[in-house]
Amino acid sequence: MARTIINNKQVFQSYVLTTAKYDFSPYEKRIMYRLIELAQKEIEGIKLKDNLRKIAPTNFGREITMPVSDILKDEQDKHYTIAKAAFRSLSEKHIEYEDDEVWSYTPIITAPEIKKNSGSVKFYVFDNIWRCLLDFTKGFKKYELITAMKFKSAYAMRFYELMSGQTKPLFVLLEGPDGLRERFYLQGSMKK
């Protein structure tokens, strides 16, 4: 069963992550939402008191422990089929970064391990991914965590992130290198 959240807290997501080009499943998005939530708690200095969630520094980043139920949306996942697929898929995805001096290609998460008796998952996040979650140099989007977690579609989640708190009309091209089709990996899937 999914984790119950009493307060619909606001989270801040890096605009770099909001506008990035990627194709995630809703469960992969929920893993990312939980990472953003944990990263913000760490920088705010909030201690995790429930003994179910942990952020432990390592030589290369963070070791994250959390309940598998944190990524579910009112479903039962008795044999961890949904969770295994989501963590496996996200561990196969990378963030590619390049500027004038550096090129890097880093997995988003590594070594996911589900402990079936306790219902928890442990995985690792490299420092440059952790920093990306907290990179507000290009701005940020603020949205309600519970609302974002409730959507069934990854596209609905992405639109919610883009539109949340928007007071002026948002003009985003449909076509082109920064268009919605390319950002959402929908090239060739819809008729013009």
What are these regions (language model features)?
Residues 1-192:
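Charged, alpha-helix-forming regions
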